Amino acid sequence: MAAWGERLAGVRGVLLDISGVLYDGGEGGGAAIAGSVEAVARLKRSRLKVRFCTNESQKSRADLVGLLRRLGFDVSEGEVTAPAPAACLILKQRGLRPHLLVHDGVRSEFDQIDTSNPNCVVIADAGEGFSYQNMNKAFQVLMELENPVLFSLGKGRYYKETSGLMLDVGPYMKALEYACGIEAEVVGKPSPEFFKSALQEMGVEAHEAIMIGDDIVGDVGGAQRYGMRALQVRTGKFRPSDEHHPEVKADGYVDNLAEAVDLLLQHADK
């Protein structure tokens, strides 16, 4: 692998995943990952542009930012690219009325959306809401439509909380795809449109940006396919087998966000 200076040269913007990179969710809101609060502060004091890019779909953007601030992070709503607001924009543009299979914590993001007589389904990480009854209702709505449309806020397989690994929205999305014989439209990582909007909001080109995440497929693979560079942290959902993934190879592997920031401040924007 090339030297760090070569791999990080010309980076002007940094996209940060949140869960598994900044903090691990769980009881009482979860816990910041060691060194991550100061790492974010150091990045923001540098010349590099910083944006937070998350597939979080159990909390509204306001609630997520509130949690991060309580954990000590310097972050504002305007710095966060999240899938629920992006999905609302798509629904309005296309005149769609969703049946929502989402967590109560994110439902407020859809307050301005008409959900009467639904002509599509939006699925997110509903947690305990993924009951047979709720999954079957989403299935029935889709099967009654002539042209069924399913939106999924991300398609992650699992994520890490302080109590252990938790199933993400992806397995439930796949179940509805299989049952209905359709393919979901993913809003969130690894969708190219999601990375595009985050970079536009940050004001940098793909080749000038780097993604830092714990998901080898959604964060690293998605960013690289869009023309960005990507580092994987060995925190959150990281597993040692990720470093030998058959299809995705990160531009570098670091122990945590603090190490990534050390390297970026040493080598980026040169």
From Swiss-Prot:
Where does the protein end up?
Cytoplasm; Nucleus
Key words, A-Z: Cytoplasm, Hydrolase, Magnesium, Metal-binding, Nucleus
Tissue specificity field: Detected in liver (at protein level).
Biological process according to GO: phosphate-containing compound metabolic process
Q: Per its UniProt entry, what is the enzyme's top EC class, as one word?
A: hydrolase
Superkingdom of this entry's organism? Answer: Eukaryota
- One Pfam family it belongs to: Hydrolase_like
Positions with a binding annotation for Mg(2+)? D17, S19, D214
Gene3D superfamilies listed in its UniProt record: HAD superfamily/HAD-like
- Chain sites annotated for binding substrate: D17, I18, S19, T54, N55, K189
Q: Which reaction does it catalyse?
A: diphosphate + H2O = 2 phosphate + H(+)
List the GO molecular function terms. Answer: inorganic diphosphate phosphatase activity; metal ion binding; phosphatase activity
Q: Does this entry carry the keyword Metal-binding?
A: yes
This protein's GO cellular component annotations are: cytoplasm; cytosol; nucleus
The cofactor required is:
Mg(2+)
Describe the function of this protein. Phosphatase that hydrolyzes imidodiphosphate, 3-phosphohistidine and 6-phospholysine. Has broad substrate specificity and can also hydrolyze inorganic diphosphate, but with lower efficiency.
The family line of this record is: Belongs to the HAD-like hydrolase superfamily.
Subunit structure, as described in the record = Homodimer.
Q: By what name is this protein known?
A: Phospholysine phosphohistidine inorganic pyrophosphate phosphatase
Instruction: Give the gene that encodes this protein.
Output: LHPP
